[in-house]
Amino acid sequence: MPVITITNGLQLTFQKPVSSLEIAKYISSNCEQNCIASYLNNRLVDAVDLIMQDSKLDIITAEDKAGLDILRCSCNHLLGHAIKQLWPEAKMTIGKIIDKGFYYDIDLEHKLQPEDIDALEKCMHTLANKNYNIVKKYVSWQQAREIFQANGEIYKVAILDDNINQHTLVALYYYEEYVDMCRGPHAPNIRFCHHFKLQKTSITYWRNNDKNKKLQRIYGTAWGTDMQLKCYLQSLQEVKKRDHRKIGQQLDLYHIQEEAPGMVFWHVDGWIIFRELETFIRSKLQTYKYQEVKSPVMIDRTLWEQTGHWSNYAEHIFTTSSENREYCIKPMNCPGHVQIFNQQINSYRDLPLRMAEFGSCYRNEPSGSLHGLMRVRNFTQDDAHIFCTEEQVCDEINNNIKMLYEVYHTFGFKKILVNLSTRPAHRIGNDKIWDKAEQDLATTLTNNGILFKYNVGAGAFYGPKIEFTLLDSFDRAWQCGTIQLDFSLPSRLKAFYINKNNQRLVPVMIHRAILGSLERFIGILIEEYAGFFPTWLAPTQVVLMNISDNQSNYVIQLMQKLSTANIRAKIDLRNEKIGFKIREHTLRRVPYMLICGDQEIKMGKVTIRTRYGKNLGMFEMNNFIEKLQHEINHRNLSQIEK
């Protein structure tokens, strides 16, 4: 007789094992209709799983975060069902739940076209309207293998052979005649899967290896209600308008061409933004007492073998050779910084030594993964490495956390997610070292009152790391900052310092990046601001324009004042209507347009208009410059008011 305690404190006693769905029905018909799964003693279970003993139960609906993930998992399997209806010859590989959606990779000779995706979506709706129950069965590993072998699902057989213990039970989910394996949970009935949209297809490879079979990936999104789906699709349209590749072209910021895939040609205005970011970060480096250095782009392969990068990271490293020597084009800056540290004998009094570099790095990313500024092969890291004693680690991490948050808040990012990535299976260093490194990071985050999640097994091969992920105005996640402890690399490269007892000790090395890749961060900013950069970042901050030729000399005089004040300004003396000029510079997202007519000359002032169409009225030039300099110097996000 299991006694079930519901979240609200209600206790229910049953004479026999009971499922969450049956309990929901007992509570109310509405609860039964909305029950998609449950937390049983804080563990996610299917709504149809039987509860055998006294338990705590929290019923999950499609409105909950966990419920949405379950709904999307079920929609993904509904997609599989529809694929097999339309193309029985398709071979199913793996499907995954991703942020706000799902995807399934399939092996199908027929290349999917837009009309095929429309047909798939229609088939999914037809199947969902049948309101069939989704059936869960546990079978032995051997039984599962026989089922998939009989169905010709060679990839499922491979997954069973390579990834699943032969002594475990395998959960199979039946969507009518379509069967797939999954950890679950799934919705109890297909009626939960009505509010979805198939979005796009792409090419991928079995096990992410381009030497394996080419697959087609189908992406979709799914939501609990039709209104949620419509709102999400509407936000996607807005995101599409903000595509950094499109705006980058409109504003003439940069380009990428075939002859240099994943490498950026910065144009004048784009390079201004790049340099402003560098200047901002440099100001932080000075405040936090960093030394700036520059290390070579190419270093002999033997050094990368010594560091462990070659054995752990070789597929991402570009190489070149000269005079019978093989060189690696650096994918990261850390080995070079250790070489600089090693050029002198350092005392404990010299520590912490904070070494920063805007390092130009190259990584051999697959061509199919390249995406504008967001995924490139050549990028600039705002990289730093701190050499310190074990006793100094927590203070240094504290300082880095403070600096990161100051930088992110300057750009207007308030929602910051933090993950602590722990030791991967393939790593260097012993477990004792990893235990200490992970504990130091966790303790510092806790002491700072920062909520974080563990990302188990996602650390670098040489140390655990804290990852800072920014949520933009569309709640898209951008992982930018990292703070990473490394007790191994300094030892491998024979770095040491002399302690107060005149002994040689290996320093702790902290890897730190704030923006990460400057190229990628500019892409993020373009989309976050829709090209409306804060004035301090805007390539052109002010445009001066005349109404007629009578004001040309006055405009030129005012331009000289702006130049003297180090404000990035341009003049527009073209013989065009003033409305035309205003529209053109508004489209260029110039923060301030200064209009000069006869009235302005008479009063010795200028009329100021913002790119948002706001007329600020007339200002004396010196007064405007003073306000503008304050806005720029304080890196304000807001503009001058009347």
From Swiss-Prot:
Region (Catalytic): 243-534
One MF term in the entry's GO annotations: ATP binding
Textual note on the cofactor: Binds 1 zinc ion per subunit.
Domain of life, source organism: Bacteria
Gene Ontology cellular-component annotations: cytosol
Family: Belongs to the class-II aminoacyl-tRNA synthetase family.
Assembly: Homodimer.
Protein name: Threonine--tRNA ligase
